[in-house]
Amino acid sequence: MAKSLRSKWKRKMRAEKRKKNAPKELERLKSILRTGADVVMEEVKEVATVLPAKEALEKQDDCKMDVDNKRNKKTLLDQHGQYPIWMNSRQRKKLKAQRLKGKKKSKLPKGLAW
C-alpha cells in the first residue's frame, strides 16, 4: 500500500522532534544513572535472585516443545483436527475452504461420459 502524504509528514515531524529533544533526553538518562544507580540495583537485588550461568542453562533444558502431536505438513492439522494456536482465524478459514473444495468435486457416472 502506498504511503500517504499525511503519514510521510508525521514521520518527518516525529524525526525532527526526536532531534530537538535528544540532548534533553540524554541528560535525563544520565542523571538517572548518576543519582540512583546504587539504589536501583539494591531494589533489583531484593526482587530478583541472581543465579550462576550453569544453573540457568540447566533450568532451560527442562522445557519441552510440543513435538508429541503428529501434524500433517500439508494441511497443518494435528491428529485431533486442530490447527496450531499461532494460526489466525482467517488463515484457518482459507485452509478449510481449500480442503472442502477438493472434497466436493463430484465424479461423473461411468455410463454418461461422452
Swiss-Prot record:
Gene Ontology process terms (BP): dendrite extension; positive regulation of dendritic spine development
Keyword Ligase: no
Principal subcellular localization: nucleus
MF term (GO), any: basal RNA polymerase II transcription machinery binding
InterPro entries on file: LLPH-like
Organism for this UniProt entry: Gallus gallus (Chicken)
Residues annotated as transmembrane: none
Lineage: superkingdom: Eukaryota
Pfam families: LLPH
The protein's name in its UniProt record: Protein LLP homolog
Keyword Disulfide bond: no
Function: Regulates dendritic and spine growth and synaptic transmission.
